[in-house]
Amino acid sequence: MTSQPSSGKGRGRNLSIDEYNVYDDAKTYYTTEDRHHNHRAGARTRTYSQNSLFKQFERLGLQKEPYRRGSHDESTIPQSRRFLIQVEPTLQSLQSQEDTDGNMQITIEDNGPKVLSLRTAASNGYNRFDIRGTYMLSNLLQELYLAKEYGRKQIILDEARLNENPVNRLSRLIKDHFWEGLTRRIDASSIEIAARDPKDWTDDPRPRIYIPRGAPEQHEYYTKVALDRPELRLDVQYLPEKITPEIVRDMNAKPGLLAVDMEEVVDPKTGEKTLRGRPFVVPGGRFNELYGWDSYMESLGLLVNDRVDLAKSMVQNFCFCIKHYGKILNATRSYYLCRSQPPFLTDMTLRVYDKIKHEPGALEFLRQSLLAAIKEYYSVWTAEPRLDPVTGLSRYRPEGLGVPPETEAGHFIHILEPYAKKHNMSFDEFVYAYNHGEIKEPTLDDYFMHDRAVRESGHDTTYRFEGICADLATIDLNSLLFKYETDIARTIRNVFHDKFEVPDDWLATNNPAASKLETSAMWDRRAKRRKLAIDKYLWNEEAGMYFDYNTATRKQCNYESATTFWALWAGVSNPKQAAAMVTKALPKLEAFGGLLSGTKESRGEIGLERPNRQWDYPYGWAPQQILAWTGLYRYGFNEEAERLAYKWLFMITKAFVDFNGVVVEKYDVTRPIDPHRVDAEYGNQGLDFKGVAKEGFGWVNASYVYGLQIVNAHMRRALGTLTPYETFMKAVEENRNKALSELV
């Protein structure tokens, strides 16, 4: 960008927006002192100077700026307009006038006049200009909150920040603010907050961290932190060597954070070597632990935004987890030690490697990541209990005992109460006895086995999985494993000269198929076998889509899910199957705002006794959109991919414009007006902010910047003007017909 002009030669010419860096991130924008002095106004004799204007307000004790009649600026001027603003009085005026429902946001649901007059910098505050409409006023609210946060009492604000193209604004916020707001690292700088657990229901909740035996340097590091800062009450524990369901259950009395990867650095203050946590991105602002498949989706957005360092760091954290905990965990808390999440490590690794392959250490990064993925494949997904030996397909089927510990026992009171009465015990007595095997209830065992499987699937919750999840060979999981097999085969063949040695410390000892020397042929054969099994058990020719297969009943299920498109993402479908899905499945699953999680018919009727589930109709989720777009593009269905991406991006942008910059975890893709409103369990993450959103939601942020790579330039311009897809396509068709008619 061009630096700010000096007070000499450049004063008289028209200045572009870029020359004033008006789209700088908030920290730069509001902490650059020179920006907020009014160099641009020429001398005037009949007006306030900037300082005297503000001082006069203070002398008069005014909380609102005095209004001057007949001194409005023209609506158009040759250069970008700027405003002289007193932050606190303007913020109070704005909120009292426009935030009529008092939720510290300005939305289309507020019924204020939707106009506020601001003093212009070009007139030294003498003239005013009206800011109109929900979008500009809500942007003003957000900018004032940010200015206040950075300690500014008065600012010169560029109008361009208020009427910025919403696609550009949201993209900029994601890149400059949201990723930063969602980035965490686990070390002394953050352990007090990160190690505290809102799901710690014990009598003495305190920060606690578990260190694997293979990382003694981390145990030494955190022990020193605990000794140096006794006020933290930090409990540093070694993790047991062998992790079993019984050990995990007993650890629930002392739940804690699990250590992730650290790097050796030199402390700039002392000059001594120390450890620093490798950073990672969390799903939402209230989280502090590393999550599983959220991290993959986030990495796609990070790579678009050139945050390769963060995406690489997250891969390294995953490798640490596989090496020391045996798997990529649902999240890095002790009660998740038996549970994984949908596996995406090979694709994540290869995307990062493609960005860094010319850097020193890139090949070693790829080697370590491949070792981790191979170990995870053997020890988690193709071993008991997740492998179904009959079909050769895999299931979400984590080990575990008793009631899932991250939920309050009361969450399952309707399930457990009858059993407590049956055994003539109090609720708490029964839960303890059942969890510790003192009472045997096979029906409850099955219920919680399926409940754990739903949570491992990442699709918690949905009627697709209720009461059967652990028995299902799903199209989503088996597509991901097919992708592992083809990725590993290709990488061994093309990068490691078709011989890949596995050292003893990376060998999966619980699976006889694991080898010390891996070749591409071994993995090619696995991929072919899995494709044959997927075609036999999961593909439905008549329906033109994939369904889950119940390994207990030996029958194909009939729930129509957007995960059918994961097969396109993984490359498991043949061209005929891909075309059938576009013809038959896509019309059933496409809605106003993109892809539905499932069809209305598959969900069934809902009511008081059968409430909405968040992974069912009418909700849409970022991962389903991303994988479908990528898969459709892979098979040449570019127009369909662009259409779905446009609808999703339009819905997010419209909610962002109408509802004070909101970006949430999931959307009701059937609602044109307020799709961020979700009436299902768990509510919606990303709604609860005051004034300005700081984080958005991880995988939705990623879907936005990734989706903008899918749509074409014409579509992006139309999104910036909030043009609905049908209106856009009608205009495109009219232009096309006009162009055809003009051809000779």
From Swiss-Prot:
Residue positions of the active site: 460, 665
Pathway it works in: Carbohydrate degradation
GO biological process: ascospore formation; trehalose catabolic process
One cellular-component annotation, GO: alpha,alpha-trehalose-phosphate synthase complex (UDP-forming)
List of residues binding Ca(2+): 99, 101, 103, 105, 110
InterPro entries according to UniProt: 6-hairpin_glycosidase_sf (IPR008928), 6hp_glycosidase-like_sf (IPR012341), Glyco_hydro_37 (IPR001661), Glyco_hydro_37_CS (IPR018232), Trehalase_Ca-bd (IPR011120)
Reaction equation(s) it catalyzes: alpha,alpha-trehalose + H2O = alpha-D-glucose + beta-D-glucose
GO molecular function annotations of the record: alpha,alpha-trehalase activity; calcium ion binding
Keyword match Cytoplasm: yes
Induction per the UniProt record: Induced during recovery from thermal stress.
Function: Hydrolyzes intracellular trehalose to glucose.
Protein name per its UniProtKB record: Cytosolic neutral trehalase
Encoding gene per record: treB
